[in-house]
Swiss-Prot record:
SUPFAM superfamilies assigned: Nucleic acid-binding proteins, Translation proteins SH3-like domain
Keywords: Cytoplasm, Elongation factor, Protein biosynthesis
NCBIfam families: efp (TIGR00038), PRK00529.1 (NF001810)
InterPro entries: Elong-fact-P_C, NA-bd_OB-fold, Rib_uL2_dom2, Transl_elong_fac_P/YeiP, Transl_elong_KOW-like, Transl_elong_P/YeiP_cen, Transl_elong_P/YeiP_CS, Transl_elongation_fac_P
Highest taxon of source: Bacteria
Protein name as annotated: Elongation factor P
Length: 187
């Protein structure tokens, strides 16, 4: 479906110069001279490249709708990850690169949402928050309790996060997958 430059919104998938791009940041600019345009920061869904493109309000671009399917993560085999379609029980293997930094939070049996374009997997969306265990945390320095200071800690998957002073090794916490930040203590 074709949309004009001013109708582009964050999260839209656009077909641009032969590739699929996800619009990330968008800024409407109206210079003193000349017509208004949308400055769009986009990320290529295939290779991860980022680019900035100006779309004039009169320009049109193809907005693509991706199909989504529920999958379950099964196992890793080298650089490949294997998922199972929850409806048909078919298995599909994808490269780890497709998940980027989020691959560290992938857990056996985790339910994920796969985005498909013309039946080909484009991206894998993990749950927004996952539970992880602290394996190492710095000790609290006396007198730091008055301010909201955070200390570094290492999770069971090797990811380093900043946590409140009361969190110790062995504590289970909830982590935001996208920002890789501490959310709260797990119940």
């Amino acid at each position: 479906m074709k949309i004009s430059g001013v109708d582009i919104r964050p999260g839209n998938i656009l077909e641009y110069e032969g590739g699929l791009w996800r619009a990330a940041k968008i800024q409407h600019t109206q210079p003193g001279k000349g017509g208004a345009y949308m400055q769009v920061e986009m990320k290529n869904l295939i290779d991860g490249r980022k680019t900035n493109v100006r779309f004039r309000s009169a320009e049109t671009v193809e907005r693509v709708r991706l199909d989504t399917k529920d999958f379950q993560y099964l196992f890793a085999d080298g650089d490949m990850l294997t998922f199972m379609d929850k409806e048909t029980y078919e298995q599909i293997s994808l490269p780890k690169d497709l998940l980027g930094d989020a691959v560290a939070f992938l857990q056996d049996g985790m339910d994920v949402v796969m985005e498909l374009y013309e039946e080909k997997p484009i991206s894998v969306q993990l749950p927004e928050q996952v539970e992880a265990e602290i394996v190492e945390a710095d000790a609290v320095v006396k007198g730091q309790t008055a301010s909201s200071s955070y200390k570094p800690a290492i999770l069971d998957n090797g990811v380093r996060v900043m946590v409140p002073p009361h969190i110790t090794a062995g504590t289970r916490i909830i982590v935001d997958v996208n920002t890789q930040e501490y959310v709260k203590r797990a119940d």
